[in-house]
Amino acid sequence: MDWPIMQIQSLLLKPMFKMKSLLVAGLMMSGFVFGQRINSDTLKVAHDDGLIVYANKPYPLSKKGQVFAFFGWNRGAFSNSDIHFTGNGYDFQLNNVSARDRPTKLGIVYIDPSWFTVVQYNFRAGYFIKDNLALVLGIDHMKYVMNQNQTVDFSGTISDPKYAAMVQNGQVNLADEQFLTFEHTDGLNYENLGLEKYKNLVHKKNVDLIWSYGAGLGFMFPKSNVKLFGNDRSDRFHVAGMGTDLRSSLNLVFWNHWMIRAEAKAGYINMWDIKTTLNNKPDKARQDFVFGQVLAGIGYTFNTKKYN
């Protein structure tokens, strides 16, 4: 009678040994997996209850609370515009006036802090108000110079016979600078606030490539250099109008902090209160035009939130 019982016990114990072997192997494997070193892109956060949670380290230019600052240099282009002048004894418009930017010759001025306002520069300071969305404060210091060697269409009236005589067949030649010199070279300052959306395109060790796009709105604060009819040159800062833009950029970020930025933007500027005299007379000009801009420079980004 004992032999059948031993056979039954043997049949029951074999599966139990197999299950125990599988359980031990599973525990060993789990110990191996959970005992691995946490990836360098993860963060360990300790809570008050003593529980430790591992979370992915945020990519640069992606997370709410991140900040960046940027300084760079630009080239600009402007559409032709109609410029309307009003003042004591005149009310006229010059049509289809062309203009260009005025980049500073490459040299030490581009890296000398005491001369940084001489060049066409850009400044950005951004704060991520939510993941992948930043509120960006910007200063675009462009330079706008009316092309002097041009003949433009004229419409309106001038009471001074000397300058009225310069209008021939409904046109005026600006080449000799006696009638008008007109520029915003200190500069065409566009102070703007924008919203920018960011997307990480490439994430490698110590290098990220990030694309952004957005729009901005702001006011124009030019220092306009205008000399009309031989009057004293107007050369002062003044809030003259408003601007708006669309922009897109590529950002290379190294070691999660240092960044190189290249940006293109297009926008519209309307200035209805350009001062044309040094005094407080009501003399002024107004113009509107479309602009394009490309810029590049360097910056730095960091997290405001501390991680343990």
Predicted regions and their residues:
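Gram-negative (and chloroplast) outer-membrane scaffold detector with strong preference
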Residues: 60-65, 124-227, 299-304
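Bacterial Sec-dependent N-terminal signal peptides
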Residues: 1-44, 308
